[in-house]
Amino acid sequence: MASFFSDFGLMWYLEELNKKEFVKFKEFLKQEVLQLGLKQVSWTEVKKASRQDLASLLLKHYEEKPAWDMTFRFFQKINRKDLIERAKREIDGCPKLYRAHMKTKMTHDSSRAFTISIQNFLKEKFTEDDYDCFENLFQSKGTESKPQVVFLSGGAGVGKTLMLKRLMLAWIESPVFLHKFSYIFYFCCREVKQLKTASLAELISREWPGPSAPIEEILSKPEKLLFIIDSLEGMECDLFKWESELCDNCTEKQPVNVLLSSLLRRKMLPESSLLISATPESFEKMENRIEYTHVKIIKGLKERNIKMSFHRLFQDRNRAHEAFSLVRENEQLFTVCQVPVLCWMVATCLKEEIEKGRDPVSICRCTTSLYTTHIFNLFIPQNAHSPSKKSQDQLQGLCSLAAEGMWTDTFVFGEEALRRNGIMDSDIPILLDIGMLINIRESEKSYIFLHPSVQEVCAAIFYLLKSHVDHPSQEVKSIEKLMFAFLKKVKVQWIFFGSFIFGLLHESEQKKLEAFFGHQLSQEIKRQLYQCLETISGNEELQEQIDGMKLFYCLFEMDDDTFLVEAMNCMEQINFVAKDYSDVIVAAHCLKHCFTLKKLSFSTQNVLSGAQEHSYMERLLTAWNHICSVFIISKDIQELRMKDTNLSESAFSVLYNNLKYHNYTLNVLVANNVFFVCEKYLFFELIQNCNLQHLNLSLTILSHSDVKLLCDVLSQAECNIEELVVAACSISSDDCKVFASVLISNKTLKHLNLASNTLDKGIASLCKSLCHPDCILEHLVLANCSLNEKCWDYLSEVLRRNKTLSHLDISSNDLKDEGLKVLCRALTLPDSVLKSLSLRHCLITISGCQDLAEVLRNNQNLVSLQVSNNKLEDTGVKLLCDAIKHPNCHLEDLGLEACELTGACCEDLASTFTQCKTLWAMNLLKNALDYNGLVVLCEALKQQTCATYVLGLQITDFDTETQAFLVAEQEKNPCLRILSSL
């Protein structure tokens, strides 16, 4: 009972009383407390006490058992026996029983690899820092208490599940969360996916210790529930597609993707809290679609944990040190060891090699070598030199199973899948015993590989042994399709698959495979891989889609210099993101052999920021120098794009020295969200290049002195920059004067993007220059620039006098109808030259549509109008449609996204399709259009007089009937393109 009171149980039950019952409770407390032989509490305090205050008073004045007995007595008198029964179960039973069950389940968990050394991490004592870390995840900001939605983001297998298990143990064993959550339920998406359909009640019952869970009681306090959704990427589907199918009934069976989507989208139990783990790729897809309260990045085991694991396993201190040193010297293996189960695998493999008297250095040559050595060791008995025929068949069956899983996005396998791939029922206990397979749930015959990367290496081995045409599943595709899917990151779950294929082609790996399986391997696969690279070489669009780091790791694992040089010189365009030390080393290994590069795009995030230890920084800078040497050895680099990169002074110096005398071929330079520790004039020296035509510095902070340096370059006679993008660069109103002079003096600048800078008063000086006859600017973006009502007169004057400006974007400013009226006076003039106007998020209403309609009837040059995210409504759009049908209107593209339209306006919209001969695109996303309205639109789109063929609609936003109708209309009308983004 002590723990229950410490959990504020009394307060919870007092909150269950309505106002009348609560008053009666207080009166009984005043009348009967002396009869019970207890000390009287001040009536003044009791009378004014809230439920929380009264709970505190009772806990303060009475011992726990008497206080609880008294509470039961008063509940009886006010006829709330239901609370008594529930409270007794709570004190003696349900949450306590559940916590005890979960503790037993986790500490004796055979459902995953926790039976190995992972148990050591679960058994580590919790420190105060651990508790603080866990508690901070669910700390509400400010005084408002609201449901928490927390993301754990980290690579596959990096230890997210381990952290979730430790968090649950912390909740079970300590008071860290007991006051916050009555129940924590853990759902692994890869397991849930196997169910196909389920209700939330059924998922909860699966975790319950008894035959049936008290669902009604559990769900009665949703704010006391935490749902852990682990490995969200395991659902392998878009959980945001089923808007119309979301459900709030916890007992109703749903497809599991709809069920999880209902939880994530807060349709079901919105008062509950969520803790979601996902890979960075999955998180990136969702971060703008879920309102989360906290994100924690999981980077895996720290060096001390890895070292400790080796010492625990080896016991012999010297051997442990030898093995750990080998791993520490190999950055790729060390990165692998940050994943708990792989740390155990690496240490086990090295231990076995050392105990057999073999040289462990050879298997640390690359990651592939260590994986294959570990796997082959599992199948070869301790004193044998080669595997039995049965072992060969078992591994071959596993490789076939793994390949099927990679192509079908399956990581949990039933017995039928095992049999289909040649694994007999009698093989399963052996594969479980050696640790190749793991039974994820004792009550169900479902299995996973030790780790997804083990499945990947087995799948790679399949391709070295057989052709895809020999596989029992037609889902398994050719090596060419595999490599393109891997390099283009079509399947985000494929982390090592392609690089293992390359790694297995190394001579030493070929010998190991031939020795294990007893036959020579075909060399055809190497030729096929080179053909893939040649295909990429001749296709610029394909090169844009290739993930450079994936390609680099493939070539690094192969460790074949001849093939590396040939492969790198197939590439004219490379795009890579280096997220850690290992990535930089691998990228350097490849790029120093690239002689044909024309376009380079990279991000090094904070890897080169100088935060590392001195010894690491030296090695990093050497590798960074190899990367930057590509500017010297590739003689024709035309585009350089840097993004999300923080360079220390030393790192910038390396870039500068390699680029300074070899930047003359650059015509595009992009530095987005880049931070340099250097003398800024050095960077601006790099853009003094007469061939440079496009410069984009968005999200890179520019001081006033930086702006002056930039404008000095722009003012030089030899400057040929045509497009300048300085969006979100912290440019101020004072900086506008500097830019204003450039608009007059520069004879090449045609595009200027100043979006998301606070220009305010500075717009006056810009507009003055824009009115100057020497200004040749054609394209101006001032979106989200904090423009106010005084700015519209200045811009109106520009629209009257400037004869070159064809595009103006002033979206996300408080234009309002009054400001729009000022601009429209200029736009209705017969000599207006503006062709494109963007007014998204400008607080325009129906009234403003009257002025826009006047422009459309009089301005024959305007071909694009974007008025999305304004409250135009059906009435306002009718005004626009009537104007679009006017013979003087030549509009081609109209944006009406999120304009609060309904199906009632579809007749008006449809009439523009058939009567306007120029309108080819209309964006209608995020409007409440209905089935009948869409039928009208689609009927118009089929008419011969219709010029429109691009329609912005999110098909999945509609109900099932409407979705089917739109899909059918697209099939009937081959010219029609319905797009979910415009």
Curated annotation (Swiss-Prot):
Domain Pyrin: 1-93
Paired cysteines (S-S): none
All copies of domain NACHT, residue ranges: 148-471
SMART domains cross-referenced by the UniProt entry: LRR_RI (SM00368), PYRIN (SM01289)
Pfam families: LRR_6, NACHT, NLRC4_HD2, NOD2_WH, PYRIN
GO molecular function: ATP binding
Superkingdom field: Eukaryota
Intervals holding LRR repeats: 594-618, 634-658, 689-712, 746-773, 777-801, 802-825, 827-847, 859-882, 888-911, 916-943
Protein's GO biological process: inflammatory response
Residues spanning the signal sequence: none
Alphabetized SUPFAM superfamilies for the sequence: DEATH domain, RNI-like
Residues engaged in binding ATP: 154-161
Keywords: ATP-binding, Inflammatory response, Leucine-rich repeat, Nucleotide-binding, Repeat
PANTHER family named in the record: NACHT, LRR AND PYD DOMAINS-CONTAINING PROTEIN 12, NACHT, LRR AND PYD DOMAINS-CONTAINING PROTEIN 4A
Family membership noted in the UniProt record: Belongs to the NLRP family.
Function: May be involved in inflammation and recognition of cytosolic pathogen-associated molecular patterns (PAMPs) not intercepted by membrane-bound receptors.
Name of the featured protein: NACHT, LRR and PYD domains-containing protein 4A
Species name: Mus musculus (Mouse)
